[in-house]
Amino acid sequence: VGSEMCIRDRALGANVIVCEVDPLKALEAAMEGYRVMPIAEAAKEGDLFLTVTGDKHVVDVHHILEMKDGAFLANSGHFDWEINVEGLKKHAVEIREIRPNLEEYKLDNGKSVYVFAQGRLVNLVSAEGHPASVMDMSFANQALGIEFLVKNKGKLENKLYTLCLLYTSPSPRDVEE
């Protein structure tokens, strides 16, 4: 999801900075021409912060306090905890609704930041859900998972399986003539 968002944002003219903790994914982002840096550095430069990680507090209070006055934050990841909104509230001297699903947090350091959808999943709370292309991939992955379960009935251990490792591109040796 993150790489697709970067592609679209760059196509719209954004100067995209990628904050990636996985070294391989960070290298891929750099090879695609994106600037890559830790969130602690990016916090000082960015105007709009979009999270798509699924990890807790990837944008934490100390990052937010370093952001420019007027920065925007949105979470499009997997859970409501990517932006530490509860911690942010402790530094807010005033919170006001600008419009539905957009709040201004006036902070005790004199800056203001704007949070979409109260830090919840902005693509679900503020919009009408996922685009059709995302749903197509989600349903295709679910179908592949069901196919795997059916083909391996009675052979599987009671554990989690990673779908992307089960279905890889065939090598030339795998293709029959």
Language model feature labels by segment:
Residues 21-24, 37, 44, 58, ...:
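Conserved active-site and cofactor/substrate-binding residues in soluble primary-metabolism enzymes
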Residues 23-24, 55-56, 78-81, 120-122, ...:
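Short, glycine-/Ser/Thr-/acidic-enriched flexible segments
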Residues 1-7, 167-177:
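Single conserved hydrophobic/aromatic residue that forms the stacking wall/gate
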Residues 85-169, 173:
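Adenosine-phosphate binding glycine-rich loop
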Residues 3-4, 8-43, 51:
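Glycine-rich phosphate/diphosphate-binding loop of Rossmann-like nucleotide-binding domains
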Residues 15, 41-44, 48, 52-57, ...:
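Metallocofactor- and cofactor-centric catalytic cores in central/energy metabolism, strongly enriched
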Residues 35-111:
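Rossmann-like adenosine-cofactor binding region
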